[in-house]
């Protein structure tokens, strides 16, 4: 087990991210274990599933949506295998992987592979049903797919990538909004999309009032669907307060534990945590 007092003061990264914020907001001590001590993190087959679906979507979009579904699935399969093999290199015994319901670690790898294939198909099908929703092209001529961004919140730099920025019609006028592709069961809420929207407003002077998640669904679901969020209350100042709070926690090493049975169950570093709730 690891204790904060046993370590020397760490050198935090120079930038923040949505994922850093989310971890600190959920449990500062988890951030300490994951990002500072970098203890072993329990693998789960849903991680390569998500990575591979995102990669396949990116490849298809960059083809101008002309790549055949079979070729997109082949790209998915390649990315899935690479991601799984990388995780197996670190934790070759799948008995130590997360199980999912009745499926142990090994069985869940195969199950998640099949779920991801269906999600790739649903992703392509979604845009076949709504072809007017196209990827926004940035002023530099590049389509906004995996768009790298950086926002400065009074000295706190936030970096990351936006899955995609799409054009759509709002009140009979052309508008844009950030979209995140989700392979899990639940959307991630407003904060992530609000950060993306703020970047688009700061960098490109775009008016962005909403964002959404493209939910590729569970296995057996027929179609992907959209979950929208109104982002109008997320101002630059409000986001600045949140990121400055997270930055303060990290830089001043205020890694207080916040144990909770539900959170701890899905925490990949719970096995190294002295505060774990059962």
Region spans (language model):
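Charged, terminal alpha-helix-loop-beta segments
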Residues: 118-122, 142-148, 152, 262, ...
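Non-catalytic protein-protein interaction segments used by genome-maintenance enzymes to assemble
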Residues: 139, 144-198, 204
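Catalytic phosphate/metal-binding cores of nucleic-acid and nucleotide-processing enzymes, i.e., regions
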Residues: 24, 32-36, 139, 158, ...
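A non-catalytic, helix-rich entry segment at domain boundaries
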Residues: 56-147
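A short beta-strand motif that forms part of the nucleic acid-binding face
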Residues: 37, 181-185, 215-217
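An acidic intrinsically disordered interaction segment
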Residues: 7-26, 154-164, 232-240
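Metal-dependent nuclease catalytic regions and adjoining charged, substrate-binding loops involved
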Residues: 5-6, 154, 188, 201-278
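Charged, glycine-rich intrinsically disordered N-terminal tails and low-complexity linkers that flank
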Residues: 1-75, 79
